[in-house]
From Swiss-Prot:
InterPro entries associated with the record: NA-bd_OB-fold, Ribosomal_uS17, Ribosomal_uS17_bact/chlr, Ribosomal_uS17_CS
General function of this protein: One of the primary rRNA binding proteins, it binds specifically to the 5'-end of 16S ribosomal RNA.
Taxonomy of the source species: Bacteria, Pseudomonadati, Pseudomonadota, Gammaproteobacteria, Legionellales
Keywords, in A-Z order: Ribonucleoprotein, Ribosomal protein, RNA-binding, rRNA-binding
GO terms classed as biological process: translation
Gene Ontology molecular functions: rRNA binding; structural constituent of ribosome
Subunit structure: Part of the 30S ribosomal subunit.
Protein name as annotated: Small ribosomal subunit protein uS17
Length: 89
């Protein structure tokens, strides 16, 4: 890695909304251990990500990475679509 490059955080999640122009809402799940009982619990976060070509559809599994702030709520951008959602007709 060059000294000019820096590590960029990337996450994987599911698209839950694509109603905005150039934006998708991605739900990222993580597993957290309960402090007292030790059971693993699913916790999720909804992140607004920039989707330049409006390619993300609801149900797609996508990879997003952190970037400069694009708007008040968007600091992530869509990198690639790992798995497309099944079409329901």
């Amino acid at each position: 890695m060059n000294k000019n490059e820096k590590m960029v955080r990337s996450l994987m999640g599911t698209v839950v909304s694509n109603k905005m122009n150039d934006t998708v809402v991605v739900r990222v799940e993580r597993r957290v251990k309960h402090p007292k009982y030790g059971k693993f619990i699913k916790r999720s976060t909804k992140i607004h990500a920039h989707d330049k070509g409006n390619e993300g559809q609801i149900g797609d599994i996508v990879t997003i990475r952190e970037c400069r702030p694009i708007s008040k709520t968007k600091s992530w951008t869509l990198v690639k679509i790992n798995e497309r959602a099944e079409k329901v007709e």
